[in-house]
Amino acid sequence: MSGRTYRVTGINLKGIPLGEADRIVTILTREQGLIRAVAKGSRKQPSKLGGRMEPFVINDLLMVRGRWSAQTETSQRLQRIVQAETLQTFPRLSRSLAHLTAAQYLAEVALLLALPDQAQEELFVVLVEHLERIERAASEQAVLPLLTHGLYHLLALAGFAPQVQACYFCQGGLVGSVFFSPQWGGLICDPCRVAQRPSPIAWVSASALRALGSLPSSTLPLPEDSLPLAAWLEAERLLRRVLEHHTDREIRSAELLASCYAVPTANGQGSPAFPEGHPEKWASA
């Protein structure tokens, strides 16, 4: 191989058209972190690269280092994909909108956390592991806890994981009213809320507190149906606030996720299944 060619293993997270026949693919790789590469002719039929460039396909890739391009999404050099050998796909992610949306959600998170030109094997492994769990989920109801679990583990990998098993300030137990602040590192007991006055802050329901407390485990200890979907929606929403605080970016898939788990209201419209009385706005302490 020449000095400009190299091999990586990567999972496709995003693709955008380029011209009439090509595609720019954003790939999370074990060896080089996040790379953006041109898949020439991949939108033509037939094409050796076509199906291999779809989202959530893991390939062994032969790459050519590109030259500087002012048209790329960032200031990275644009690479070129020469060959791709598929190692793994996730066909069952398309079994429902919830499965696919959860996968897209975690892909968005990985895109926010990944770094270019740096080996990020652990991020690659954690993302793939949680995509496999979501793909195996037997029902849409089972997807949401797995998504929330994956979100927490990605936050932990980036050093952003909030405190979810004790009060952030006093490290004491969580009894009575419990609150959550993304800026202040997670759960806060009521006495510390009064003393420290963190802001913004949200009240946490008892069921969401249980959901949050289960997340640091490598696998979810709770049966998938032991908590209402509202608890997992609430937990996901709180963790998403942490991600947004640290990255200053929103997760576009979150709105679609909420619609997947909407419950009918009296007028027949859907609304997110938050528990009765849960505040919809974050308040000052």
UniProtKB/Swiss-Prot annotation:
This is DNA repair protein RecO. InterPro entries: ARFGAP/RecO, DNA_rep/recomb_RecO_N, NA-bd_OB-fold, RecO, RecO_C. Involved in DNA repair and RecF pathway recombination. Signal peptide: none annotated. It comes from Synechococcus sp. (strain JA-2-3B'a(2-13)) (Cyanobacteria bacterium Yellowstone B-Prime). GO terms for biological process: DNA recombination; double-strand break repair. Belongs to the RecO family. It comes from the Bacteria. Pfam families: RecO_C (PF02565), RecO_N (PF11967).
